[in-house]
Amino acid sequence: MAVKIRLRRMGSKRNAHYRLVVADSRKPRDGRFVEEIGYYNPTTEPATVKVDEEKAIKWLKNGAQPSNTVRSLLKKTGVLAKFREQQQ
């Protein structure tokens, strides 16, 4: 199973917020997912990002590939740096 960490759209029209989820890459964007690891709300000022670091690092170690947007969010929160430290 090819696993990705990606954003799942929530909210109403023009008021979107997202959940960071681990999902099979073959499933639809808002379809079934394996585990929820955080959320992202771009409409607040400044944008709100919360990530469960333990879960995110666990999935990255298991080979889950983050999408481009999720990768940038993980960099901002410092999770990607912690993951790279643990790899060395």
Swiss-Prot record:
Coiled coil: none
Pfam families hit by this protein: Ribosomal_S16
Keyword Ribosomal protein in record: yes
Keywords assigned by UniProt, alphabetized: Ribonucleoprotein, Ribosomal protein
GO BP field: translation
A GO cellular component annotation in the UniProt record: small ribosomal subunit
GO molecular function, one term: structural constituent of ribosome
Disulfide bridges in this chain: none
HAMAP family assigned to the protein according to its UniProt record, in alphabetical order: Ribosomal_bS16
Record family assignment: Belongs to the bacterial ribosomal protein bS16 family.
Protein name: Small ribosomal subunit protein bS16
Annotated source species: Halothermothrix orenii (strain H 168 / OCM 544 / DSM 9562)
The organism's taxonomic lineage, starting at the top: Bacteria, Bacillati, Bacillota, Clostridia, Halanaerobiales
